[in-house]
């Protein structure tokens, strides 16, 4: 497989609820973060590919890992990330953890309970936050708050895309026991709108995601880099709005995402709030970290 061939899908263009190298991030960090992002998107393309067999997907993911570790030069995404990490003297541990999650996407299509979902988040979401913190030289003491924030964002994404994931990928992140407790079934995820039972299930999970996001609020005060602190504040503002929408709307019936105007308004509001906190010692988003 050459650098110009191999699996490609529309995953590069899909909205995800985790940090990318926005204009807020200092320019000196953007190249590495973007290299990481492109590597992750390539792995996502593979795991979500519509026509590749599971064994083929795993082989491609193994190739990405091998080349990230220096064994080959055919995948530009792996080579560029490896080079960028080497330049900064950073190990590939977080990218390797994410590859574990993509392998889970290939081999595990159902989750029995909340604990299994959180275990998936340990590989699919938490490494993203840890990577960004490491790039900025932040202490590992910030990881617990980052972990719950990233897990909350991941659960929100699962709820936003639950119908599409089921119909397009036969992949269900909604735990079986939550469906059962509400009297809903997996097959209902293919419907044009949610039953009352499905809405009860999805909203109960949105409430759990909200608890995680509240725990992640502690990250704002823990981060030392002021640009990254603004970035976290903006992400939290977006997440608060999304989770409130998930508690009121039906993701099977309508697209539960922020509009460009909402993104702008919430971003400006979050930055203004953080600026006020820095100037006057006030803030509204300081919560205790929760265990996951």
Curated annotation (Swiss-Prot):
Catalytic activities: presqualene diphosphate + H2O = hydroxysqualene + diphosphate
Keywords from the named record: Lyase, Plasmid
The enzyme's E.C. designation: 4.2.3.156
The protein's annotated pathway: Secondary metabolite biosynthesis; hopanoid biosynthesis
Name of one Pfam family that matches: SQS_PSY
Gene Ontology terms: biological process: terpenoid biosynthetic process
Molecular function terms, GO-annotated: geranylgeranyl diphosphate synthase activity; lyase activity; squalene synthase [NAD(P)H] activity
Gene3D superfamilies in the record: Farnesyl Diphosphate Synthase (1.10.600.10)
Domain of life of the native organism: Bacteria
Cited function: Involved in the biosynthesis of the hopanoid precursor squalene (SQ) from farnesyl diphosphate (FPP). Catalyzes the second step, the conversion of presqualene diphosphate (PSPP) to hydroxysqualene (HSQ).
Family annotation (PANTHER family): BIFUNCTIONAL LYCOPENE CYCLASE/PHYTOENE SYNTHASE
The protein's name: Hydroxysqualene synthase
Species of the source: Sinorhizobium fredii (strain NBRC 101917 / NGR234)
């Amino acid at each position: 497989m050459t650098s110009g061939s191999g699996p490609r899908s529309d995953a590069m263009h899909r909205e995800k609820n985790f940090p990318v190298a926005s204009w807020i991030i200092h320019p000196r960090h953007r190249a590495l973060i973007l290299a990481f992002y492109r590597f992750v998107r390539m792995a996502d393309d593979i795991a979500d590919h519509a026509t590749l067999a599971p064994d083929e997907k795993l082989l491609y993911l193994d190739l990405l890992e091998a080349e990230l570790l220096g064994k080959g030069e055919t995948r530009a995404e792996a080579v560029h990330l490896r080079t960028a990490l080497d330049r900064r003297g950073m190990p590939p541990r977080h990218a390797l953890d994410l590859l574990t999650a993509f392998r889970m996407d290939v081999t595990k299509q159902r989750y029995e309970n909340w604990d299994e979902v959180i275990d998936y988040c340990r590989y699919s979401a938490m490494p993203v936050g840890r990577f960004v913190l490491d790039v900025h030289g932040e202490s590992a003491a910030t990881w617990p708050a980052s972990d719950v924030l990233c897990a909350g964002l991941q659960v929100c994404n699962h709820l936003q895309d639950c119908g599409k994931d089921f119909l397009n990928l036969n992949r269900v992140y909604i735990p079986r026991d939550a469906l059962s407790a509400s009297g809903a079934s997996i097959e209902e995820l293919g419907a044009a709108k949610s039953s009352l039972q499905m809405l009860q299930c999805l909203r109960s999970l949105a409430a759990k995601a909200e608890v995680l996001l509240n725990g992640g609020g502690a990250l704002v005060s823990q981060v030392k880099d002021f640009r990254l602190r603004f970035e976290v504040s903006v992400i939290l503002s977006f997440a608060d709005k999304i989770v409130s929408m998930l508690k009121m709307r039906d993701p099977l019936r309508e697209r539960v995402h922020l509009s460009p105007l909402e993104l702008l308004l919430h971003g400006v509001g979050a930055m203004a709030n953080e600026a006020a906190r820095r100037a006057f010692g006030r803030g509204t988003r300081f919560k205790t970290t929760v265990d996951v």
